[in-house]
Amino acid sequence: MTHLYNGMSTTAGDLLYPNPGRLLPGMTSVNGEFQVPRHVLRPDSIVICDSVRHPRRVRYQVPAKYRAVAHALAHPGTTLTGFGALALYGLPHLVDAHDTVLISPTLHAKKRGSTFEPALVRKQLEPEELWQMECRGELITVVAPPVAVVQALQLIRSRQCAWPVLASEDEEAFVRAVQLVDASRRFLALTPEAIAVAGKGRVNNRWLASVLKASSALAESPKETEMRLIAQEVARQFGLKLEEQVEFWANGKLVTRADLAFPEARIALYYDGRHHDDASTRLRDTSIDLYLTSINWRPLRYGTNMLSGLVGHLEVVLRERGFVKVDEPPSLSGWL
């Protein structure tokens, strides 16, 4: 978890090299002033996939934190906002596919972002909403973390920033918003109260309140958030309790921590990221599953592109274990 404070420093500028007007060996351009080593670039497959949902199909190979510092240093007197600010604060998820947006007090006309240029806008901010960050021996101005979250939520709600989620079209923005708030709470230690204060006058209060109510500080990834929102619908249908980060102990030792669990039905849910594909991790997962089965728990594991089957799997297992639906679930927008 990142410790955030006004005046903090960032190492994101350490890999920036002056752009001499030609591409140096092993480097790629960030903008007209800076280059970064190619080894930091995002995988082509992910970049292409993300660009499909960008409003102008812009492809961003350079991670957001490097673009953020490069553009801020190249545009002195501006303020870094939204997803770019969150990337610089250390948010590890959801930030890399979007424009870097700078607020310029002298701007006459809004400018769109592109692969090598930031978006430029003109907005008013209160003095207490501005932080200073040291980078490469210089100070850059960045919006305070809660304000950055709210600015990102504005872009999500207006569908200017999107990524794939399992939800109906009218509920997609809500799911993405909860994912962003979850990540901000988990990795940046932001509170719902601070986000709510920053949201006044910027985002619809009722919508923001529903997002904050549905959020959690325990989700370790956006996909885990997505899994929780789906599982909550099933829990409501069956009148069951859903818990997060449930620990299992044996002989005084922690055996596993399930991402989610239905205690009454003894079902444990896991979202397994890419690191679970290596042999040693798979072996450990198998050992955990065998232990859970031995104590009459049913482990269910999900990975990339597998969450669409979660509802059906849960319903089958719950019925096998003697549970029946007690209510039809409200939609996610029922929180609105």
Residue ranges and their predicted role:
Residues 1-201, 334-336:
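Short gly/ser-rich loop at a beta-strand->alpha-helix junction or flexible surface loop bordering the NTP-binding
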Residues 7, 185-336:
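Surface segments flanking catalytic/ligand-binding clefts of nucleic-acid enzymes
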